[in-house]
Amino acid sequence: MPQRFLTLADVTDELNISAAQAYALVRSGELPAIQVGGRGQWRVEMSELEAYIQRMYAQTRQRIEAGDFDG
C-alpha cells in the first residue's frame, strides 16, 4: 500500500528544497498540510504534493509562454 502522508523531511527530499522552504510553503498555504500528534508534526498528503507540483508546472509554462525566463 503506497504511503498516503509525507513528513516535511520527505517533502524536502522530493522537491530538493530546504526544511525552511518546505515549512514556508505550508505556512503560506501554498502546500496544504495537517498537524498531527501531541507535538503537532506536519504531514502533507501525497495527492496535495502532486497537485502542488502540477501547479508549479502550469506556472512555469505560463512564464515561458510570456517570455519570462528568469521567474
Regions found by a protein language model. Give the residues of each.
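Residue-identity detector for glutamine
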Residues: 3, 21, 35, 41, ...
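A short, Lys/Arg-enriched interface patch at domain edges and termini
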Residues: 47-71
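Polyanion-binding surface elements
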Residues: 1-22, 55
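Structural detector for helix-capping/boundary residues
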Residues: 9, 29, 46-47
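Intrinsically disordered, low-complexity regulatory regions of eukaryotic regulatory proteins
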Residues: 28, 43, 66-68
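Major-groove DNA-recognition helix of helix-turn-helix-type DNA-binding domains
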Residues: 15-41
